[in-house]
Amino acid sequence: MSGWPVLPALLLAVAMSSFHSATSRDEERNRLLMREKMMQVGGQLVLQEEEERANGRLQALKEAEMQEAKRTGIFPPSLHFFQAKGLMEKSAVFNILKKMPKGAALHVHDFGMVSMDWLVKNATYRPYCYFCLTPKGATQFKFAHPPPPTPKQEECSEWVLLEKFRKGLPNVTEFDNSLLRTFTLMTENPQETYANQDMVWKKFKTIFFAISGLVNYAPVFRDFIFLGLEEFYQDQVLYLELRAMLYPVYELNGMVHSREWSVRTYEEVARTFAKTHPGFIGIKLIYSDHRSKDVSLIKESVQRAMELRAKFPQMVAGFDLVGREDTGHSLYDYKEALMIPASRGVKLPYFFHAGETDWQGTSADRNLLDALILNSTRIGHGFALSKHPAVWADAWRKDIPLEVCPISNQVLKLVSDLRNHPAAVLMATGYPMVISSDDPAAFGAKGLSYDFYEAFMGLGGLTADLRTLKQLAMNSIRYSALSETEKKVAMETWEERWHRFVAELTRGPK
């Protein structure tokens, strides 16, 4: 019987061991969670007391939306943007993000920055606006007085005065709606309308062909720039860097302006805009050309970019190549042209689109290698970066950020559910990035808020919080082409607005 008292002691020892084991497991788990939280974008930031309260409210709303999405099976980032947009606009989180000071938009194409609705309702209603149809059914516009000469039959039908054409229509609204459909990718059934990438890119290209005759008309051009700045300013964006191809801008009498005139016009409009918009920081242009062109033409473009930057150092930030990577020339194809500045000892910053593809091992995929080798200041999209561990490591070491455009990547069919976007992994590891919107008008969006929502809810999941948003906004200034002095002023302006935003978020709805 003397052995019996030993049993409770053994049981107690086992229980204590299990308790310590469970405790150590919990501690280890918490340490892992904390390490991951510290690693993610914004994880190193320490929030002030008021920011913590604001974060608590934001995360409560976010969690409620996610719980509702789990219950209903309807989660906007998992849906195509055209079907998710209306749901997003009802979201409490989205409406908070609309008020959030976002800093800068660093990946926006000039022709895609203004609501297409304005082009239809304003630009096409101006006097002397003509249109014609190409043999393939594409619409082309031109302002002219006297009327433009009859085009060649293989190029376009006869020019028709739009004002006169509308007068003969039984339903002008339906015609205007058809124009709007021509100017955007928006459709009720995107999966059916755009069954593959070729189809969506084909329509995408026709949009810019259609609107070019409107936007490049000098009076529209000025108003277009101003309105683009207005739309982003209303969305709490104070600075933009625009990819601009600087197509010839023309007057009513047919006179065509130089690229220098266009750059000066951007400069003048931005200066005028700043006078009536407190806190607006400005714009810079990234001169761009199309990657479908021959090497000899890209050599000329690089030369032109150097000249424009020398003439407008405060306005022209650098050079990029635009257009679909999968079907265009690779950066490697253009290496001879792209080495010209370095061979002449001229600094021409590059802001290359690279890796906007889901075809691994192709020349488009390997654009990431050449963007790194050519010291691209930032990388546009970089969708394929996670498939290139060496490039990923070296680009991170060089502090080369990605310009992530979630909606663009989804609409152009690189990814369907944004929770599966490769930038979700990059965001979790803390890779430097900014959020931008590419061609928001073509997607039926405005400004940056829609992309921020997709990034915050879809890419970041529940772990992304106010720190993530704050870091992304700060990154947009840090990785901009502004000078160090300009960045300091921009950051101060942003911080002032950020504090107001946090105070309002803490107070909650009135």
UniProtKB/Swiss-Prot annotation:
Glycans are attached at residues 122, 171, 375. Residues 25-95 are annotated as: Dimerization. SUPFAM superfamilies: Metallo-dependent hydrolases (SSF51556). One of its GO terms (molecular function) is proteoglycan binding. It is found in: Secreted. It holds the Pfam family A_deaminase_N. Substrate binds at residues 110, 201-208, 290, 323, 439. The keyword Magnesium does not apply. Its cofactor is Zn(2+). Its EC number is 3.5.4.4. Binds 1 zinc ion per subunit. Residues 1-24 form the signal peptide. The PRB domain is involved in receptor binding, and may be responsible for the cytokine-like growth factor activity due to it's sharing of several structural properties with chemokines. High-affinity binding to heparin/glycosaminoclycan (GAG) is mediated by a large, highly positively charged surface at the interface of dimer's subunits involving approximately residues 25-40, 386-393, and 419-425. Adenosine deaminase that may contribute to the degradation of extracellular adenosine, a signaling molecule that controls a variety of cellular responses. Requires elevated adenosine levels for optimal enzyme activity. Binds to cell surfaces via proteoglycans and may play a role in the regulation of cell proliferation and differentiation, independently of its enzyme activity. Belongs to the metallo-dependent hydrolases superfamily. Adenosine and AMP deaminases family. ADGF subfamily. This is Adenosine deaminase 2. It comes from Sus scrofa. The lineage of its organism: Eukaryota, Metazoa, Chordata, Craniata, Vertebrata.
